Amino acid sequence: MKVKEEKAGVGKLDHTNHRRRFPDQKECPPIHIGLPVPTYPQRKTDQKGHLSGLQKVHWGLRPDQPQQELTGPGSGASSQDSSMDLISRTRSPAAEQLQDILGEEDEAPNPTLFTEMDTLQHDGDQMEWKESARWIKFEEKVEEGGERWSKPHVSTLSLHSLFELRTCLQTGTVLLDLDSGSLPQIIDDVIEKQIEDGLLRPELRERVSYVLLRRHRHQTKKPIHRSLADIGKSVSTTNRSPARSPGAGPSLHHSTEDLRMRQSANYGRLCHAQSRSMNDISLTPNTDQRKNKFMKKIPKDSEASNVLVGEVDFLDQPFIAFVRLIQSAMLGGVTEVPVPTRFLFILLGPSGRAKSYNEIGRAIATLMVDDLFSDVAYKARNREDLIAGIDEFLDEVIVLPPGEWDPNIRIEPPKKVPSADKRKSVFSLAELGQMNGSVGGGGGAPGGGNGGGGGGGSGGGAGSGGAGGTSSGDDGEMPAMHEIGEELIWTGRFFGGLCLDIKRKLPWFPSDFYDGFHIQSISAILFIYLGCITNAITFGGLLGDATDNYQGVMESFLGTAMAGSLFCLFSGQPLIILSSTGPILIFEKLLFDFSKGNGLDYMEFRLWIGLHSAVQCLILVATDASFIIKYITRFTEEGFSTLISFIFIYDAIKKMIGAFKYYPINMDFKPNFITTYKCECVAPDTVNTTVFNASAPLAPDTNASLYNLLNLTALDWSLLSKKECLSYGGRLLGNSCKFIPDLALMSFILFFGTYSMTLTLKKFKFSRYFPTKVRALVADFSIVFSILMFCGIDACFGLETPKLHVPSVIKPTRPDRGWFVAPFGKNPWWVYPASILPALLVTILIFMDQQITAVIVNRKENKLKKAAGYHLDLFWVGILMALCSFMGLPWYVAATVISIAHIDSLKMETETSAPGEQPQFLGVREQRVTGIIVFILTGISVFLAPILKCIPLPVLYGVFLYMGVASLNGIQMGTGGSEFKIQKKLTPFWERCKLFLMPAKHQPDHAFLRHVPLRRIHLFTLVQILCLAVLWILKSTVAAIIFPVMILGLIIVRRLLDFIFSQHDLAWIDNILPEKEKKETDKKRKRKKGAHEDCDEEPQFPPPSVIKIPMESVQSDPQNGIHCIARKRSSSWSYSL
């Protein structure tokens, strides 16, 4: 058996050592202590009092260092030199020790720890261990009634319990890498070590072993109907529980006295073998453990940490042990769930201090689930490593004043838990302990003697010195710089960026397919498919109106299917969805009007513009022109994304208003005059054989055409429908011909109902109803459920609401054009070179639209693991543009709104999360399968016409509205699990717009509001709103032809903002431009270098693991330079004590 044995370092538990620690001397250095002591030197009776009943130790004192070296009166000058050496160190010994322990970052992460605390319960002459609390991330307690678990909550610990825990680890038995596989063997080894160190009398071996091997009763689900005997037994157990309130003291005393009398003989007769035979713990997990549903909350490959605390009457001093097994082992029924145990903490103490023992147990249990301390516990080499871990934990502790907070209030788990990476990587005192939400705090403000030195009354004075630190607005930590990936580095080689994109994406190509085989992909396919066909039909119809059906719905369907599937198959970022966009539609309309007004053939002219634009895109790819995207900051992203979102919202509402115009409501309807309302078809005044639509049928079930009729006089005009009447030249006569109130109102119900239901189902994921998987399923398929619901409602009412029109035959919309556009023959020769100029405008539009969307998709907060491919994406957009121009299909570019929706539908979260912990955002399921299937389904949708024609158009308008609103909120992405360091620089446009309507006291606690004046934030937002208004006006007027140039102008406007705002302000509300980043980085490097030189010349910080409380008033010329340190210290200890 290989055991790393640790000496206790301190003898038996008595209080004489404690009294010797405070020698009577008038002028002495500050005393190094481990428990809070009175600040005033005149109250020496308190210094000699009984503090905890546990052994007190010196903080900052190593076991191999004599006590007199720091506190003895005869230490002399060497003591002062030693103190100055400690003070001059800018990092604490605990920090250096932890850096040595956790220095290797390339090691595999340690398993997640499930911690369970059991308390010893007495019931007459019987004893058992009862589960009282458990931890994965947050604490869950067994409620007083014992029937249920409490809600997960943040553990609130008393500072005293942490100090006593530190003492326990210093004085108790610590066994690291113990090679034992069962609980009896572990207990034997622990007891043997205690006897060997003189911490336990040999005659108590069997008694301690008997107690530790009692049965463990876990909090399991009990039946609703229980017998009266069971209820009475539980009540009596509750009354006699040693962990209850002080009012239960007498019954506890009687039970323990009775237990002593009944079992004293048994304890004396037990031998080693008998103690093993009296083991009540099963060696293998029982059925209840295996069927425990709580296992779903525990991550895979987790290990357990068991905490056993209790009081017994035969011990005079506490029995303390901390054990780490060399290999985790199943200890049978010790743990609630079948998880192997790696750590064991035992605390048995004399009777009368059950509450103190429970608090110590809660303290060690909370520490074991702390990310940093758990790593220390796994890698600790000796006792001092564990104590250093506690010291670091205390560095981060925040104390709540007892008069301002009720400790009985359970703190709800935060929605976002700060990462422990910063604590693991940074142990410098200058970057520790950001209190009360201060971000990037600098050093503490110069405090007085009371504030910095802690000479004030109770802890509050100590906190004032460090809390009033200098804001990071002056010289403190700035938000993360605008990171530019290697994809946007200018190579200087011909097609250099494209070649690098291909090299980066080629290794990921196979995984792009098998990563898509997941049930989440099904919901994403259905969602994006409905959005794509809605977009194709809507923009196809608008293109047909704008180009006299040279491009219609059929061309839109086929072009979307062909361009989208090829792009998803070969592009650099397959999560981007290609579609027709509003800017492209505007340009197409202007181009058709120009061609028609100048007698040019529209399709041929468009072909040459498309070819020139494709060549220009390839030139941009060859010269690595995409590197200018690094100048696209959040200012440009927010402006462009907001504009596209507004276009979606505007078009959806405009379509709905159009339904009210086409199916108007009779506002003057009077029920009393209902008999006067009628509408009939009247024959035209002059009837001849000239028909308006010769192929139209006479009636819905009549196939005969009007060519078979000799004249129209034989028609019964009153039997014709509205459409037929108008087609044949008839007139509608009556006062109710224009009013169809049911269709307009029903269309609005379908429109708003689809939007509202989709939004509600999306939010249902964060509700408290139903299990997590059910809520996730409902949220993923919210669009599908909403469409099916309101299609069913429409079918039930049977109203003739406008339905989706899908062509059922694959042929061009105009019969006078084919599927190939000839490049020559219809326009003058000068048109071919002259088309370069409009092609340049198209190229600017394509480049900006494509690359801004790519920047939004490739944001760092989306946590994409596979490389982006800006050059490769633009290459394929150019190729597809030339192909679509030859076939007479619409041009396609990245659709911002649908791409954001695609990202949102493929987000991944942790499958298991600790109770009370929000699911962590893991990233996006990066693959090509969903996009390819979506566009294939779009192409074959022409064969699904019988099904798709049942979908009402108002339902699709509701989907459009949801996509616009969701993308408007999607601009604020980064709230779902991204690191706090990223959150500091996120300044959503919409959130800043809301600040105009909020009083300062009600404004959210955004990080940028702490560092940038509100008037500067408002000015920045007004500039964005002005740019957005200019873009909207240009889009809606005849000046829309320069719309692409104005999008490029957003980058110029952002460049000019450098002359209005400081780089500090822009770093918090936007991003710093690349050349400015370099200057800021150089300045920061110089500042750090200067600060480092200053630290070498003058000490800045004391070690945080040493508490210095001067026992005499601080004089104007203090010894050892303590006064200077008190004014400069910014250690987190000044906040805590």
Swiss-Prot record:
Reported tissue expression: Highest expression observed in liver, spleen and testis; moderate expression in the choroid plexus, hippocampus, cerebrum and cerebellum of brain, and in kidney cortex and kidney medulla. Also observed in heart, pancreas, muscle, lung, placenta, stomach and small intestine. Weakest expression seen in peripheral blood lymphocytes, colon, duodenum, jejunum, ileum and skeletal muscle.
Membrane topology: Multi-pass membrane protein
Catalytic activity: 2 hydrogencarbonate(out) + Na(+)(out) = 2 hydrogencarbonate(in) + Na(+)(in); 3 hydrogencarbonate(out) + Na(+)(out) = 3 hydrogencarbonate(in) + Na(+)(in)
Biased segments, Basic and acidic residues type: 1-29
Superkingdom of source: Eukaryota
A Pfam short name: HCO3_cotransp
Extracellular side: 545-555, 629-742, 796-828, 884-888, 949-953, 1035-1039
Transmembrane segments: 522-544, 556-587, 607-628, 743-762, 774-795, 829-847, 867-883, 889-908, 929-948, 954-971, 1017-1034, 1040-1057
Activity regulation information from UniProt: Activity is inhibited by 4,4'-di-isothiocyanatostilbene-2,2'-disulfonic acid (DIDS - an inhibitor of several anion channels and transporters).
Residue intervals on the Cytoplasmic side: 1-521, 588-606, 763-773, 848-866, 909-928, 972-1016, 1058-1137
Skewed-composition ranges (Gly residues): 438-471
Biased composition (Polar residues): 65-91
Disordered, as annotated region: 1-52, 64-94, 221-255, 438-478, 1079-1137
InterPro entries noted in UniProt: Band3_cytoplasmic_dom, HCO3_transpt-like_TM_dom, HCO3_transpt_euk, Na/HCO3_transpt, PTrfase/Anion_transptr
Entry's localization field: Apical cell membrane; Basolateral cell membrane
Gene3D superfamilies with a match to the protein in the record: Helical hairpin bin (1.10.287.570), Mannitol-specific EII, Chain A (3.40.930.10)
Entry function: Mediates sodium- and bicarbonate-dependent electrogenic sodium bicarbonate cotransport, with a Na(+):HCO3(-) stoichiometry varying from 1:2 to 1:3.
Name of the protein: Electrogenic sodium bicarbonate cotransporter 4
Phylogenetic placement of the source organism: Eukaryota, Metazoa, Chordata, Craniata, Vertebrata
Gene: SLC4A5
